[in-house]
Amino acid sequence: MTEYLLSAGICMAIVSILLIGMAISNVSKEQYAKRFFFFATSCLVLTLVVASSLSSSANASQTDNGVNRSGSEYPTVYSATSTKKLHKEPATLIKAIDGDTVKLMYKGQPMTFRLLLVDTPETKHPKKGVEKYGPEASAFTKKMVENAKKIEVEFDKGQRTDKYGRGLAYIYADGKMVNEALVRQGLAKVAYVYKPNNTHEQLLRKSEAQAKKEKLNIWSEDNADSGQ
């Protein structure tokens, strides 16, 4: 504010001196008016430029890398469509139970995990018994997890366990998602989709569509009448 007043004062002083000089010289009224308008306009423009520059400098000095002088950070604004990032956690294999169920050592405790968003044909169901392609799905999962050097679990954003106490997660074997691999091979269907535990739903549906197109296993023609 002080610099602004100083600039305006200097301009007014210059204009006053010029006006006095023109008043005592042989200058016509027309020339006097033109020169007065020119100098007054120039003074106004100069004052506005200086004021704008000072204002910008003041605003810039209030922040430094997103932190104001009081030390508080500006809040991070997330879009309405942003999602919480999932992360994988290490586990070790105890055994593969069937196509969509494995038992792992997780955080020092044995825990049974049900693969999220997929359903494989049954092999041990008390009523359904052994369903077609059930043994193949079980063998596929068993081979995938037993041959892996690294097993990881990835929980979704919602419920982590089902009513039986089983963990609900995506299981990875050496970085490859077992859930997706089963669906891609036509050994599992996309099923039990409940928000918000559906982050990888579209990935699985894409793999399922490809398996259907290729008529793999449960989508094969010889399985069309089995109700699978």
UniProtKB/Swiss-Prot annotation:
Q: Which InterPro entries match?
A: SNase_OB-fold_sf, Staphylococal_nuclease_OB-fold, Thermonucl_AS
Enzyme Commission identifier(s): 3.1.31.1
Cofactor(s) needed, names only, are: Ca(2+)
Identify the domain of life: Bacteria
GO CC terms, sorted: extracellular region
Q: Which GO terms describe its molecular function?
A: endonuclease activity, active with either ribo- or deoxyribonucleic acids and producing 3'-phosphomonoesters; metal ion binding; nucleic acid binding
Query: In the UniProt record, does the keyword Ion transport occur?
Result: no
* Record keywords, A-Z: Calcium, Endonuclease, Hydrolase, Metal-binding, Nuclease, Secreted, Signal, Zymogen
Q: Which residues form the propeptide?
A: 24-60
Catalysed reaction(s) here are: Endonucleolytic cleavage to nucleoside 3'-phosphates and 3'-phosphooligonucleotide end-products
The positions making up the signal sequence are 1-23
Which family does the record claim for this protein? Belongs to the thermonuclease family.
What this chain does, per the entry, is described as: Enzyme that catalyzes the hydrolysis of both DNA and RNA at the 5' position of the phosphodiester bond.
Protein's name according to its UniProt entry: Thermonuclease
Which species does the entry assign this protein to? Staphylococcus aureus (strain MRSA252)
